[in-house]
Amino acid sequence: MPQQFEQPQAQQAATQEDDALATTQAAAQTESADQADVLDDILDDIESTLETNAEEYVNSFVQKGGE
C-alpha cells in the first residue's frame, strides 16, 4: 500500500522538473531573441552608416602617421 502513494509523488516531482525545464527553456529563447534583436539593430546601424558615408567610416579606423 505505501507503494501506491509513492508513485504519484514521483510523477509529481517529474512534472515539476518538466515545468521548471520548460520555464528555463522559454526564458533562454526569449533572451536569445532579445540578443538577436540588439545585434540586428547594430548591424542595421553599421549598414546605414556605410550606405551614407563608407569612406569616412573606413578612414576612421585607418592609422595615420605614428598613431
UniProtKB/Swiss-Prot annotation:
It comes from Bifidobacterium longum (strain DJO10A). Protein modifier that is covalently attached to lysine residues of substrate proteins, thereby targeting them for proteasomal degradation. The tagging system is termed pupylation. This is Prokaryotic ubiquitin-like protein Pup. One of its GO terms (molecular function) is proteasome binding. Pfam families: Pup. Pathway: Protein degradation; proteasomal Pup-dependent pathway. Strongly interacts with the proteasome-associated ATPase ARC through a hydrophobic interface; the interacting region of Pup lies in its C-terminal half. There is one Pup binding site per ARC hexamer ring. There is a cross-link at residue 67 (Isoglutamyl lysine isopeptide (Glu-Lys) (interchain with K-? in acceptor proteins)).
